[in-house]
């Protein structure tokens, strides 16, 4: 489940952060950053029950359990698990973009007559999203850890739920195997994010 959420949350967070940076001090900046602050402050184990209480019990507009069985049954688990990480990525994207947009090479690109779209996509985003790429490794670790809680709350048949059930049943073989798998995934994605950040940053490549 965590792997499914990673790409979607990164895209949503990057879009919100880049938009907030380009529209600084406007409603397109204030509203996404206010929502991002809420997502950062509210932990996963509290966000899940709150969403279930509001949308599943009180409003009765979304199912509160299952995965792939009913229309809309992926919405609440996705929001619970991915909201906080999309919020972190949005703030990182905004900060990175604001820093890059004030650099001399951006002013030079604009002075050459490049369109604002080309300046943002070709020049600004490459440097502005380096903090997001560096955050990918810890984000994957957090998504994997958060899947334990979310899969248990929403009764999703994933590795996180199996891990929790194995702990209650004292199934040490399952606990050991799942721990090794999660550890290998975390190490792999940390290495991948470091390599991607090195590739995106020319100064790091020159120093190495």
What kind of region is each of these model predictions?
Residues 10, 27-39:
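N-terminal signal-anchor/first transmembrane alpha helix
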């Amino acid at each position: 489940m965590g792997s499914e959420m990673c790409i979607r949350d990164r895209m949503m967070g990057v879009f919100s952060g880049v938009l907030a940076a380009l529209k600084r001090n406007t409603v397109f900046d204030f509203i996404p950053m206010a929502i991002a602050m809420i997502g950062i402050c509210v932990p996963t184990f509290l966000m899940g029950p709150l969403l279930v209480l509001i949308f599943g019990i009180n409003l009765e507009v979304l199912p509160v359990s299952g995965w792939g069985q009913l229309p809309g049954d992926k919405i609440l688990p996705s929001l619970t698990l991915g909201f906080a990480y999309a919020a972190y990525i949005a703030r990182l994207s905004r900060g990175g973009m604001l820093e890059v947009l004030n650099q001399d090479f951006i002013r030079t690109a604009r002075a050459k007559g490049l369109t604002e779209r080309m300046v943002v996509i070709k020049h600004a985003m490459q440097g502005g999203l380096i903090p997001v790429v560096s955050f990918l490794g810890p984000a994957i670790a957090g998504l994997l850890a958060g899947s334990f809680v979310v899969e248990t709350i929403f009764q999703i048949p994933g590795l996180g739920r199996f891990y929790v059930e194995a702990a209650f049943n004292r199934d040490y073989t399952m606990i050991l195997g799942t721990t090794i798998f999660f550890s290998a995934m975390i190490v792999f994605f940390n290495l991948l994010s470091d390599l991607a950040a090195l590739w995106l940053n020319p100064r790091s490549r020159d120093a190495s």
